[in-house]
Amino acid sequence: MAASFPPTLGLSSAPDEIQHPHIKFSEWKFKLFRVRSFEKTPEEAQKEKKDSFEGKPSLEQSPAVLDKADGQKPVPTQPLLKAHPKFSKKFHDNEKARGKAIHQANLRHLCRICGNSFRADEHNRRYPVHGPVDGKTLGLLRKKEKRATSWPDLIAKVFRIDVKADVDSIHPTEFCHNCWSIMHRKFSSAPCEVYFPRNVTMEWHPHTPSCDICNTARRGLKRKSLQPNLQLSKKLKTVLDQARQARQHKRRAQARISSKDVMKKIANCSKIHLSTKLLAVDFPEHFVKSISCQICEHILADPVETNCKHVFCRVCILRCLKVMGSYCPSCRYPCFPTDLESPVKSFLSVLNSLMVKCPAKECNEEVSLEKYNHHISSHKESKEIFVHINKGGRPRQHLLSLTRRAQKHRLRELKLQVKAFADKEEGGDVKSVCMTLFLLALRARNEHRQADELEAIMQGKGSGLQPAVCLAIRVNTFLSCSQYHKMYRTVKAITGRQIFQPLHALRNAEKVLLPGYHHFEWQPPLKNVSSSTDVGIIDGLSGLSSSVDDYPVDTIAKRFRYDSALVSALMDMEEDILEGMRSQDLDDYLNGPFTVVVKESCDGMGDVSEKHGSGPVVPEKAVRFSFTIMKITIAHSSQNVKVFEEAKPNSELCCKPLCLMLADESDHETLTAILSPLIAEREAMKSSELMLELGGILRTFKFIFRGTGYDEKLVREVEGLEASGSVYICTLCDATRLEASQNLVFHSITRSHAENLERYEVWRSNPYHESVEELRDRVKGVSAKPFIETVPSIDALHCDIGNAAEFYKIFQLEIGEVYKNPNASKEERKRWQATLDKHLRKKMNLKPIMRMNGNFARKLMTKETVDAVCELIPSEERHEALRELMDLYLKMKPVWRSSCPAKECPESLCQYSFNSQRFAELLSTKFKYRYEGKITNYFHKTLAHVPEIIERDGSIGAWASEGNESGNKLFRRFRKMNARQSKCYEMEDVLKHHWLYTSKYLQKFMNAHNALKTSGFTMNPQASLGDPLGIEDSLESQDSMEF
């Protein structure tokens, strides 16, 4: 039955036989759903038009029209179509905005990195893409010494995704916990593996009508499923579930097998790698799996390890990463070619020791995997060997004797093969392939020196030395700039290579090691000290005029600012501090507070020959102020943990110069003018904390200053005491010389810097209006204002020197038998001294000296010297007394000389009180002729104060001024070698050069050089095959740099 349509639909009035079948379907559809007709009769159309002018909605008032009731079926009719509000421009814009809003709302539920929905995580954990990292991640980054502190930097580093240019309407603003775990796994050594669901980077696009994100969200609303048939038996359910699970397992296994097949095809290494079937021993399956590649399932060849601890052949993993993306083929964890590392040596040794069967015909040998290549090369047939066929003509010349054009012609085939290989395997890097071939050829011929040079060039280092090494050589060998430059040019001209670095490279290396390079901060800021940190060498007068209180200051002084010098010293010790923290099982990220104990030393030098040149006339004497970092501790778990302690506190290598001046130490005004600013900086640092970035982490440091490296003359100068010949014999107690001689042993330390300041005020103001003698007795010898705080102690070096000078005098008096004849003339006394000098030179090889020094004192104070002197003394009784006196002294000496007497000489420490009392008894009986009513300053300190100082400080020898005295010799050496004529510049160069000489960073280079030189690369007969030279056993650390 045909339906008649009005002509408005555009359908032709064709016969029923040829009408398209969809017409009948349309008729049936309108009946079934009672859809209102979209067509109307002409009369209704006119009415619709009229109503539209009145503003009434037309579609609401046009009901479906039925045909006449003549038995025919109703015919759908439709009025003339009118534009719906849906098709207006305004509605279209609203729909577009609404679509974008829905799109952006959908983005909020997706991860920016992997694209997964947050609904998959039952805890709904999410993290902002932009902003700082969370606390847990920040702690991990600090522990691993990473500088990144924001999510965009971490995401770019781990996933190679730049999120800084993200737009909120296109990209999600958060990422999921799974991606957060991947980033944690990247920077931690946790054994867990994290699954990354995508093989490629997720791409995000602006919203479109066919947007995948919005369509996926719509499709998520499913129709309600039908209620399950409750009459279905449990048995049938179980069977269906088992069948479904079996199908899933089968699909997964097939997918796994297919992915393995794909990776094997990608690797395509069956011709170059060995099958596990060639193993000579039938190993367990799990062991075979552990030594085989997880891609090609062959025995590992050139194995590499990923971050997730999976092992592959290098060729296989690189090919898979190139084709399948930067993910581990085993666990899908992110992995990049730069992350690949060689496995541990123990694994490689096991792998190389595996025995494999030779696959060649008629060869039944079993060889280790390490020697397999060498063995298989012997089986090459003669047809595979390139043999030149002499076709006559001119004799064939060697390759190196040909012209460049001829060389190209002869090597053309090889060049094409190498190029093809490089294009296929190495990304077209022909240079690297050729250099590697050359390197392997050199190694095969045992030409390792050339191979090392070539390898250095390939790594971009070149065959030359680093600037820091050249600087260490220059400083250690005392070369001036001009001398080093001559050596640099000579070596470069002779060898044709730049082994040493030019001077400008050394100056750049110097800047890092000198004070004024590193940034730091004080909390609270230092009083009366500039907050700028880029302060290098400054004038010693610190901007004062050329005269102080109308006193002319004829001096040249150069110094570092104290705080800047301490910062540079700490940064120079950075590796030692961090290593000390690791050795104490402390975390690297601990920020303190660290407590730094500093030993201060100051000493005057006489007879410093003046250089000719411009500048003021200055005295031929010098004063040096220096410091040594003795110990660094950190407060941890309610106790102080020692992270650094100076092993050789009296070495010149750790005594850092702070101030140099050409002045007389007895010149009180000049000394105070130059040292007062330095002392003001020191006092300010006592009440502040240093904030310094060490090892990438901001750490806090506190300082304790101990002025112990002063001789007695300088202590009396800076503490305002009378000179050494004063009645008040001691700088530690108030005893007079008479009191000390009557009571040799029992005294205690009473003096202090604060007490000396109070006594100076009493001396200055005389509040009790006393006479000079009474006032002097009240203040116990304080006659000037103290300006440097020193620790009441004994300087071990000067104690040795003072006591040796006294024994030298006793030897002379014993030769002259003064105990019998106390009234000898001056000529006789000179004759005794000449006799002693001549005998010591003959027996002990001790040359006479004008003034006692440390070396002479050490040689003089021995039992052999006493035996030699006894040859000149006739009385046996005096022999015994003299030998006993020396024996007691040698038993006491280690207590004040050793750095830690409780460990090094505990017996001598325990017996010290007894020995000192016996020593005092001998002085007051056998040697009464000299010590009746008087005693020397250092004998008094040795007998009375040593045990108390040891109990307080733990050591006397460690706090001695010996390092500063050794530094005085270096000062003379540096001053001689310097080439600049101006005195001011000369002092700057000496200070800079001396500071670099004490750098621990530079000392490590020279210690390595000295250790190798000492070992001499000698063959150790006891060395194992793995270490034929035995270098590890023969390396020794040197005490100091060689001159």
UniProtKB/Swiss-Prot annotation:
A zinc finger (RAG1-type) spans 354-383. Residues 1-288 are annotated as: Interaction with importin alpha-1. Gene3D superfamilies: 6.10.140.510, Classic Zinc Finger, Zinc/RING finger domain, C3HC4 (zinc finger). Its main location: nucleus. It catalyses: S-ubiquitinyl-[E2 ubiquitin-conjugating enzyme]-L-cysteine + [acceptor protein]-L-lysine = [E2 ubiquitin-conjugating enzyme]-L-cysteine + N(6)-ubiquitinyl-[acceptor protein]-L-lysine. There is a cross-link at residue 234 (Glycyl lysine isopeptide (Lys-Gly) (interchain with G-Cter in ubiquitin)). Autoubiquitinated in the presence of CDC34/UBCH3. It comes from the Eukaryota. GO terms for biological process: adaptive immune response; B cell differentiation; chromatin organization; DNA recombination; immune response; negative regulation of thymocyte apoptotic process; positive regulation of T cell differentiation; pre-B cell allelic exclusion. Zn(2+) 1 binds at residues 269, 273, 296, 298. Its cofactor is Mg(2+); Mn(2+). Its EC number is 3.1.-.-, 2.3.2.27. The RING-type zinc finger mediates the E3 ubiquitin-protein ligase activity. The NBD (nonamer binding) DNA-binding domain mediates the specific binding to the nonamer RSS motif by forming a tightly interwoven homodimer that binds and synapses 2 nonamer elements, with each NBD making contact with both DNA molecules. Each RSS is composed of well-conserved heptamer (consensus 5'-CACAGTG-3') and nonamer (consensus 5'-ACAAAAACC-3') sequences separated by a spacer of either 12 bp or 23 bp. Catalytic component of the RAG complex, a multiprotein complex that mediates the DNA cleavage phase during V(D)J recombination. V(D)J recombination assembles a diverse repertoire of immunoglobulin and T-cell receptor genes in developing B and T-lymphocytes through rearrangement of different V (variable), in some cases D (diversity), and J (joining) gene segments. In the RAG complex, RAG1 mediates the DNA-binding to the conserved recombination signal sequences (RSS) and catalyzes the DNA cleavage activities by introducing a double-strand break between the RSS and the adjacent coding segment. This is V(D)J recombination-activating protein 1. It comes from Homo sapiens.
